[in-house]
Amino acid sequence: MVRELTHFIGGKHTPGASGTYGDVYDPNTGRVQARVPLAGRSETEAAIADAAEAQVEWGEWNPQRRARVLLRFLQLVEKEKDSLARLLSSEHGKTVADAHGDLARGLDVVEFAAGVPHLLKGEFSDNAGAGIDVHSLRRPLGVVAGITPFNFPAMIPLWKAAPALACGNAFILKPSERDPSVPLRLAELFLEAGLPPGVLNVVNGGKEAVDTLLEDPRVKALGFVGSTPIAAHIYATAAAHGKRAQCFGGAKNHMIVMPDADLDQAVDALIGAGYGSAGERCMAISVAVPVGEETADALVAKLTERIAGLRIGRSDDPDADFGPLVGRDAVDRVRGYVDLGVEEGAELVVDGRDFTLEGHEDGFFAGASLFDRVTPEMRIYQEEIFGPVVSVVRAADYEEALRLPSEHQYGNGVALFTRDGDIARDFTRRVETGMVGVNVPIPVPVAYHTFGGWKRSGFGDLNQHGPDAIRFYTRTKTVTSRWPASGIRDGASFTIPTMG
């Protein structure tokens, strides 16, 4: 039976009114399991109006009261995390264990945002001038919005919504129409936790909904995670309409493996970071850079052996290392890139194009592929594949290995495996990426640090979660005061005031 999904506006499930729907698939079988309404302009404007009205009161709640809502939300999610993980897995295709991780990393940011009474403390300067004190306030923006991707249907919405709500904003979430059920359930749980109706609205939709959020002057800021072309477009359009924007695009994350590295440790890291979640992660390691031919030969041999032992299965198979991709188009894209790599002259060591899961021939499965002797001019190196494909680019020495991620158009994350502290320190200072891991395969920062890439991986000067999130979702007001007012007896002054 195909489920009928809704929007979530004003604390209620709202049926679609546009007459346009998208299909939500079961990636394991390729069959449609739900229909999701795609909002038009009028529905999106209604959600904005509702949020603007609700935000007035919410923004005046004291920070500790808002934080208590987040803490109650954490308790509610904890009680049903197993069912949420299964629901997430059934629509996305990642394993249930991986879905638990998706939820957990999102909840980390909710915990961070619950510290908002401390995070919103302003600055104070006593007696900055004769009887003058200066202090700053952080005030909410009003209505803000988030456009989030299919690959983390719990984590990314929570990364954006939790700090925004904690700071006193109303939040409109436009999740991916591929797997919208978990975002809708999270909105219900926020309501149960005490969030006033309308402070968090969920609008499913496509371009028309996004354009409305970008153009409506009541929306003051917008966050996006997705492909680089769309990130660049949304950033430019938001700026043209006077909005703040933080937009995160594609990635081509490298792992540098030095000759002195623990090779078994590096292979373990690369197998998980390259093929986990079928490679559908913005922090996936898609490029391995062994330094020296001996290191490269040993790395490729060990990787080939490990790939042969990978178990690809249904997303609810507890023994599966990874499950299906999110859609048929994703499978076709991955196979197309493997075809392209062969045409470009890369050595295809492991070919996963023809993989099928017995009994699930219509499922969206792709096997693990491994290329060796990839070179920087190849498109399979330059472009994000977003699937279970790892490319090995051999570097003659450390300096060549350092140049590869530094000169790439994307600058999201990079990992270095070495036992040499001097090399590690030099690398972390010089490499041109926003996030760096040393003997850490997926360098996703903890919630109280910021997450974001450089170059064409990120647009905007403030990143996700951590202190940057608080700055992004607030504006600063600086107050200069002197008391009592009757103490001003010097008469009019026509020169700029100084504090001397």
Tell me the role of every PLM-derived stretch.
Residues 122-268, 395, 460:
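Rossmann-like NAD(P) dinucleotide-binding subdomain of oxidoreductase/dehydrogenase enzymes
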Residues 31-120, 131:
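Glycine-rich loop-to-alpha-helix module at the N-terminal edge of alpha/beta enzyme cores
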Residues 72, 131-133, 352-359, 441-443:
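Short, solvent-exposed loop/turn elements at beta->coil junctions and helix N-caps
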Residues 229-375, 404, 438, 485-489, ...:
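ALDH superfamily catalytic-core signature
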Residues 29-35, 219, 256, 304-306, ...:
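Conserved C-terminal structural/oligomerization subdomain of aldehyde/semialdehyde dehydrogenase
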Residues 1-28, 353:
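Hydrophobic face of amphipathic alpha-helices that form TPR/SEL1-like repeat modules
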Residues 33-39, 54-60, 146, 255-258, ...:
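Short, well-ordered beta-strand elements within core beta-sheets of diverse protein domains
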